[in-house]
Amino acid sequence: MIAVVQRVTKSSVEVDGKVVGEIRKGVNILLGVAEDDTEEDINKLVNKIVYLRMFEDEDKKMNYSLLDINGEALIISQFTLLANLKKGRRPSFEYAAKPDKAKALYEKFVEEFSKYVKVQTGIFGADMKVYILNDGPVTFILDSKQL
């Protein structure tokens, strides 16, 4: 499971021209589910992200977590994070979970994350427009297999 976590001042997602999710200060999470992912991967990522000290204190040091600042999360499913780009010029998605499995694990990730902070989401499988006002910019790429 791969998560691109961006510290944001605000972020929103639109589907068919309508805002379906919007947050203020917090994180935007683009989440890719791999074929071999399990609930253990969810637990590792959720625990890492909610406690990751990525928000600045008064001295401009990253000492505060999402929980410390009472931040929010916008979570977007993005299977393209699992693209294999080794051959040719067209990405292969052989490592991405099939839609049914990906949706189930994505929804479980959202459910677990919601136990800690306010969460908004996009719509799984929809064509979305994601607006991200990255703060810093501060961006982390986390792979659950490396945590």
UniProtKB/Swiss-Prot annotation:
Tell me the subunit arrangement.
Homodimer.
**Could you cite one Gene Ontology molecular function of this protein?**
D-tyrosyl-tRNA(Tyr) deacylase activity
Alphabetized InterPro entries for the sequence = Daa-tRNA_deacyls_DTD (IPR003732), DTD-like_sf (IPR023509)
Q: Where is this motif: Gly-cisPro motif, important for rejection of L-amino acids?
A: 136-137
**Name by which UniProt lists this protein:** D-aminoacyl-tRNA deacylase
Q: Where in the cell is it found?
A: Cytoplasm
Query: What Gene Ontology biological process does one annotation of this record name?
Result: D-amino acid catabolic process
Query: What keywords were assigned to this record?
Result: Cytoplasm, Hydrolase, RNA-binding, tRNA-binding
Q: What is known of its domains?
A: A Gly-cisPro motif from one monomer fits into the active site of the other monomer to allow specific chiral rejection of L-amino acids.
- Provide the species name: Sulfurihydrogenibium sp. (strain YO3AOP1)
Q: What class of enzyme is it?
A: hydrolase
> EC annotation?
3.1.1.96
By sequence similarity, the record places it as follows: Belongs to the DTD family.
Q: Which Pfam families match?
A: Tyr_Deacylase
Tell me the function of this protein: An aminoacyl-tRNA editing enzyme that deacylates mischarged D-aminoacyl-tRNAs. Also deacylates mischarged glycyl-tRNA(Ala), protecting cells against glycine mischarging by AlaRS. Acts via tRNA-based rather than protein-based catalysis; rejects L-amino acids rather than detecting D-amino acids in the active site. By recycling D-aminoacyl-tRNA to D-amino acids and free tRNA molecules, this enzyme counteracts the toxicity associated with the formation of D-aminoacyl-tRNA entities in vivo and helps enforce protein L-homochirality.
Write out the catalysed reaction.
Answer: glycyl-tRNA(Ala) + H2O = tRNA(Ala) + glycine + H(+); a D-aminoacyl-tRNA + H2O = a tRNA + a D-alpha-amino acid + H(+)
GO cellular component, alphabetical, reads: cytoplasm
